[in-house]
């Protein structure tokens, strides 16, 4: 009981193995139903096995008394205006001649074109560009060619474009609908009113489509590269803006602290002689607030281990940044030859460790800012080539790669001695000959 | 040596603790409540080391009795931690006779023999004035050495130890009075105007009669932990990082100047 409570309080992940066994659901038995048409005795002989062949329905037989013959007969087509008579073979059953119209006549569809009277034209449809004769001709062609404007444009006596013909036709229809309606609300839901024909947009759409269809492969590649570059620049700017956001929240915390008039808590870092630069104050304020809350929560526990406290501090500092940044911080610690977890976690060592992590975070933020400013500068330079053609390209500052591998890492093996505290000096001059060395692990 | 190092530690802690302590003292004066039991912004830490020492039994070793080992919790410099710890409960593997061992007197250790490596839980129970909640430590018993090249030897044991500190925030007055000037604890410097009551003589007499942890039978094999090496590592790493930060700041300021020049040109 005590151990379990302690584990819960300290948040240790010592959970026992869960041995819950799930109940197996019983599979339902399949009930074989006797198929129709087969007697019970015959089905019992099969032993319940499904029949290999489907049962044949022998009762249904084609009637033998029906007489079928094919005859060459004439027919009329109601879709035609003339009285042309044609002949075809027809299936005749029991000498009954076929009746009705030609079966394919139903596919002769026509578009419903609005008609207007001379009075309506004088009142609503007069136009400065189109004459009445031209409009009458347009509507006749729309009737004959079923609104196929490409064909209408080809046959139209006056030279007009497809867009102009469409614009005239649809504007006349809208005017007629508006004139014949009782009120404007009646025709508000009509498709021609809701989505009016836009001649300008139609022209632009066709021009763009023509350009796309006619561009060369080389131009296509160039466009793709330009789009990729623009996307990368946008992402960089977003990342830089996101990196600057924690500063704003830190300032808000500082404001809250001032408003309360209470110091957030005892400073975690030891007193340092050098003052922190102005740009580094904001992130330290953010981590200071997190440290204060973590310290308060640690104080609630009446007893805790130093390593546990350090873990909580590291988690509090890491919660403000993303997972990738945490990985980069830890990788940097390993490159510097520092243990991710101190071997001798005294208070001083833990405080130094936290300060180091904070400074590494500052370093990574500065790297992001540098990359952002470099990309910004290069984009400005490209834009200003026309204004300043003599600007040389050599003035771009190449950033130094962030690598500690070149520098000598400091790795000291810990010295192990017998009982008694080791002297504070890192390398004692004299060793006692009597004491035996412990085995190196 | 021990006194000088502990005093140095106190000196290190002094600048952090003094101002909050004075503030808490002012608060106390304002309240004029002298019966307050706990002191705020003061924490006591007890450096401890826990681990195991394992000896191979050599020719006497059998399939089930290959090693003789001892698992323990001790003060970092082998000081007597019974002023803080009342008892330690060791939870061994279930295959042992009476796997739960309660040790109520120093040295807090369990000696056994066996062949398997397993996790040992150690629950530290403190005195009533120290803390009511027990603290659990976990150590994986290690019998076989890491490097397989060397043959097994009876003369050199396998030693695996971990250093840690038990931290008591807001300790009680009686606890402070009882353990002041004790070498097992890291004691913060109290404000000059504050006086603790005199410690009781009876406990001192009782303490002398208990077993002495200085002369430990396994003391020659214990590891020594020094924070100086780790502090040097951290200081060197911080210097490198700060140098890089300064370099990046210079580059950023240079780029800003150049970008402003480019913008001015484009405006013209």
UniProtKB/Swiss-Prot annotation, chain A:
One example of a Gene Ontology biological process annotation: chromatin remodeling
Residue spans making up a coiled coil are none
User: Per the record, where are the segments of Basic residues compositional bias?
Assistant: 429-441
Cross-referenced Gene3D superfamilies, in alphabetical order? Homeodomain-like (1.10.10.60)
The segment(s) forming the SANT domain are: 126-175
Give residue spans, biased composition: Basic and acidic residues. 21-38, 373-383
Q: Where is this chain compositionally biased, Polar residues type?
A: 268-277
Q: What SUPFAM superfamilies does its record include?
A: Homeodomain-like
Give disulfide pairs as residue numbers: none
Major subcellular site = nucleus
Q: What is this protein called?
A: SWR1-complex protein 4
The gene for this chain is SWC4
Swiss-Prot record, chain B:
**Where is this chain's protein located in or outside the cell?**
Cytoplasm; Nucleus
Single GO cellular component term: cytoplasm
Write out the coiled-coil annotation as residue ranges.
229-263
- For this UniProt record, give its keywords in alphabetical order, as a comma-separated list: Activator, Chromatin regulator, Coiled coil, Cytoplasm, Developmental protein, Differentiation, DNA damage, DNA repair, Flowering, Nucleus, Transcription, Transcription regulation
Domain named YEATS: residues: 38-182
Keyword DNA repair recorded:
yes
Q: Could you tell me the Gene Ontology terms of the biological process aspect for this record?
A: cell differentiation; chromatin organization; DNA repair; flower development; regulation of DNA-templated transcription; regulation of flower development; regulation of photoperiodism, flowering; regulation of timing of transition from vegetative to reproductive phase
One Pfam entry for this protein is YEATS
Q: What happens when the gene is disrupted?
A: No visible phenotype, due to the redundancy with TAF14. Modest early flowering. Taf14 and taf14b double mutants show a pleiotropic phenotype that includes small size and abnormal leaf morphology. Taf14 and taf14b double mutants show a reduced H4K5 acetylation in the promoter region of major flowering regulator genes including FLC, CO and SOC1, and a more pronounced early flowering.
Sequence ranges of Polar residues compositional bias:
1-20
Query: Which body tissues produce this protein?
Result: Expressed in roots, leaves, inflorescence and flowering tissues.
Q: Does the keyword Ion transport apply?
A: no
Q: What is its main location?
A: cytoplasm
Q: Where is this region: Disordered?
A: 1-36
* Similarity comment: Belongs to the YAF9 family.
Subunit comment for this entry?
Component of the TFIID complex. TFIID is composed of TATA binding protein (TBP) and a number of TBP-associated factors (TAFs) whose MWs range from 14-217 kDa. Interacts with TAF1, TAF4B and TAF12B. Component of the SWR1 chromatin-remodeling complex. Interacts with FLX, a component of the transcription activator complex FRI-C. Interacts with SWC4, and with EAF1A and EAF1B (via HSA domain).
Function comment: Negative regulator of flowering controlling the H4K5 acetylation levels in the FLC and FT chromatin. Positively regulates FLC expression. Component of the transcription factor IID (TFIID) complex that is essential for mediating regulation of RNA polymerase transcription. Component of the SWR1 complex which mediates the ATP-dependent exchange of histone H2A for the H2A variant HZT1 leading to transcriptional regulation of selected genes by chromatin remodeling.
For this entry, the protein name equals: Transcription initiation factor TFIID subunit 14b
């Amino acid at each position: 009981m005590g151990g379990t409570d302690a584990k819960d309080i300290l948040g240790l992940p010592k959970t026992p193995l869960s041995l819950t066994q799930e109940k197996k659901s019983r599979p339902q038995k399949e009930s074989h139903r006797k198929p129709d048409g087969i007697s019970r005795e015959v089905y019992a002989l099969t032993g319940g096995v499904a029949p290999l062949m489907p049962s044949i329905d022998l009762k249904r037989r084609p009637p033998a008394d029906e007489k079928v013959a094919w005859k060459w007969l004439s027919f009329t087509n109601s879709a035609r205006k003339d009285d042309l008579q044609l002949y075809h073979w027809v299936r005749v059953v029991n000498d009954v001649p076929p009746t009705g119209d030609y079966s394919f006549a139903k596919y002769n569809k026509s578009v419903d074109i609005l008609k207007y009277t001379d009075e309506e034209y004088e009142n609503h449809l007069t136009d400065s560009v189109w004459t009445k004769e031209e409009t009458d001709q347009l509507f006749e062609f729309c009737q004959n060619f079923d609104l196929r404007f490409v064909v209408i444009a080809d046959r139209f006596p006056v030279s007009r474009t497809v867009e102009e013909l469409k614009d005239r036709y649809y504007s006349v229809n809208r005017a007629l609908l508006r004139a014949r309606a009782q009120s404007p609300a009646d025709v508000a839901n009509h498709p021609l009113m809701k989505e009016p024909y836009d001649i300008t947009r139609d022209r632009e759409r066709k021009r763009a489509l023509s350009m796309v269809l006619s561009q060369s492969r080389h131009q296509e590649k160039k466009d793709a590269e330009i789009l990729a570059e623009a996307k990368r620049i946008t992402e960089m700017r977003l990342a830089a803006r996101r990196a600057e956001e924690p500063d704003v929240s830190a300032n808000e915390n500082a404001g809250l602290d001032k408003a309360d008039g209470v110091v957030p808590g005892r400073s975690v870092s030891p007193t340092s002689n050098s003052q922190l630069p102005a740009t580094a104050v904001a992130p330290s304020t953010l981590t200071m607030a997190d440290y204060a809350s973590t310290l308060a929560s640690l104080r609630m526990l009446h007893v805790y281990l130093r390593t546990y406290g350090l873990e909580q501090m590291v988690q509090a500092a890491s919660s403000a940044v993303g997972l990738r940044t945490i990985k980069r911080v830890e990788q940097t610690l390993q490159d510097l030859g520092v243990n991710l977890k101190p071997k001798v976690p005294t208070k001083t060592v833990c405080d130094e460790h936290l300060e180091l992590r904070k400074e590494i975070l500052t370093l990574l933020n500065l790297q992001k800012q540098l990359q952002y400013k470099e990309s910004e500068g290069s984009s400005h330079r490209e834009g200003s080539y026309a204004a300043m053609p003599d600007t040389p390209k050599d003035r771009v500052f190449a950033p130094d790669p962030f690598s500690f591998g070149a520098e000598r890492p400091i790795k000291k093996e810990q010295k192990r001695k017998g009982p008694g505290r080791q002297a504070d000096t890192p390398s004692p001059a004299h060793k006692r000959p009597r004491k035996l060395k412990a085995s190196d692990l | 040596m021990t006194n000088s190092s502990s005093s140095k530690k106190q000196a290190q802690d002094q600048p952090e603790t003094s101002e909050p302590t004075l503030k808490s003292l002012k608060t106390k004066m304002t309240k004029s409540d002298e019966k307050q039991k706990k002191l705020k912004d003061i924490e006591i830490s007890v450096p401890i080391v826990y681990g195991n020492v394992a000896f191979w039994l050599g020719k006497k070793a059998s399939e089930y009795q290959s090693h003789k080992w001892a698992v323990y919790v001790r003060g970092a410099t082998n000081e007597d931690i019974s002023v803080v710890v009342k008892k330690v409960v060791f939870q061994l593997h279930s295959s042992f006779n009476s796997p739960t061992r309660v040790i109520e007197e120093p040295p807090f250790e369990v000696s056994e023999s066996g062949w398997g490596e397993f996790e040992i839980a150690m629950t530290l129970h403190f005195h009533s004035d120290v803390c009511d909640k027990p603290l659990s430590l976990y150590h994986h018993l290690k019998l076989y050495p890491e490097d397989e090249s060397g043959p097994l030897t009876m003369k050199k044991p396998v030693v695996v130890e971990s250093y840690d500190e038990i931290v008591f925030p807001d300790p009680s007055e009686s606890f402070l009075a009882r353990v002041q000037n004790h070498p097992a604890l890291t004691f913060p410097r109290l404000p000059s105007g504050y006086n603790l009551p005199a410690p009781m003589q009876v406990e001192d007499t009782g303490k002398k009669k208990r077993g002495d942890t200085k002369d430990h039978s396994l003391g020659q094999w214990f590891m020594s932990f020094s924070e100086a090496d780790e502090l040097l590592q951290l200081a060197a790493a911080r210097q490198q990082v700060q140098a890089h930060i300064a370099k990046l700041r210079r580059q950023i300021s240079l780029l800003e100047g150049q970008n402003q020049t480019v913008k001015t040109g484009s405006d013209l």
